[in-house]
Amino acid sequence: MQLTHQLDLFPECRVTLLLFKDVKNAGDLRRKAMEGTIDGSLINPTVIVDPFQILVAANKAVHLYKLGKMKTRTLSTEIIFNLSPNNNISEALKKFGISANDTSILIVYIEEGEKQINQEYLISQVEGHQVSLKNLPEIMNITEVKKIYKLSSQEESIGTLLDAIICRMSTKDVL
């Protein structure tokens, strides 16, 4: 149902992904996240192609956190920001964060060392059904993904969609 992954560069950190469908209280969850009463990033799964995309964003967020160079105020927001192909924080939050009308939500949280997130509490806050991450392709909107990342048909013929997305995410600080 969930995916928990230890970060290679930061073995003391674990990233957990929880996917929910048929969510009825996305607006309340968004408000709680903005108030800081929910530990985790609330992500719109329609723009996520693969869990690896999240792991790359989370790894970068932890790296910048450790360096004291995050561009946002919280680790949760930094993960969402790192999914974006550009450096506009508010645009990243609109496109990759959840909105009040969303019916699918991906919750991502990071635990470090002995620090534990109360997963049962987190799950209990969602009025919806937790589903396996294997359902992600059914939820994803390929047209929206291509639009957000400005992917060309030429790029798609050279490599995979995921490769192009990771490339966009990784090079935004360079360009």
Curated annotation (Swiss-Prot):
Pfam family, one: CGI-121
Localization per record: Cytoplasm, Cytosol; Nucleus
Superkingdom of the source species: Eukaryota
Keyword Endoplasmic reticulum: no
Keyword Nucleus among record annotations: yes
Principal subcellular localization: cytoplasm
Tissue expression remark: Widely expressed.
Record's keyword terms, sorted: Cytoplasm, Disease variant, Epilepsy, Intellectual disability, Nucleus, tRNA processing
GO CC field: cytoplasm; cytosol; EKC/KEOPS complex; nucleus
Gene3D superfamilies per UniProt: CGI121/TPRKB
GO MF, one annotated term: protein kinase binding
GO biological process: tRNA threonylcarbamoyladenosine modification
Family: Belongs to the CGI121/TPRKB family.
Clinical disorder: Galloway-Mowat syndrome 5: A form of Galloway-Mowat syndrome, a severe renal-neurological disease characterized by early-onset nephrotic syndrome associated with microcephaly, central nervous system abnormalities, developmental delays, and a propensity for seizures. Brain anomalies include gyration defects ranging from lissencephaly to pachygyria and polymicrogyria, and cerebellar hypoplasia. Most patients show facial dysmorphism characterized by a small, narrow forehead, large/floppy ears, deep-set eyes, hypertelorism and micrognathia.
Functional description taken from the UniProt entry: Component of the EKC/KEOPS complex that is required for the formation of a threonylcarbamoyl group on adenosine at position 37 (t(6)A37) in tRNAs that read codons beginning with adenine. The complex is probably involved in the transfer of the threonylcarbamoyl moiety of threonylcarbamoyl-AMP (TC-AMP) to the N6 group of A37. TPRKB acts as an allosteric effector that regulates the t(6)A activity of the complex. TPRKB is not required for tRNA modification.
Quaternary state and interactors: Component of the EKC/KEOPS complex composed of at least GON7, TP53RK, TPRKB, OSGEP and LAGE3; the whole complex dimerizes. Interacts with TP53RK/PRPK.
UniProt-recorded name of the protein: EKC/KEOPS complex subunit TPRKB
Organism annotation: Homo sapiens
Gene name of the encoded protein: TPRKB
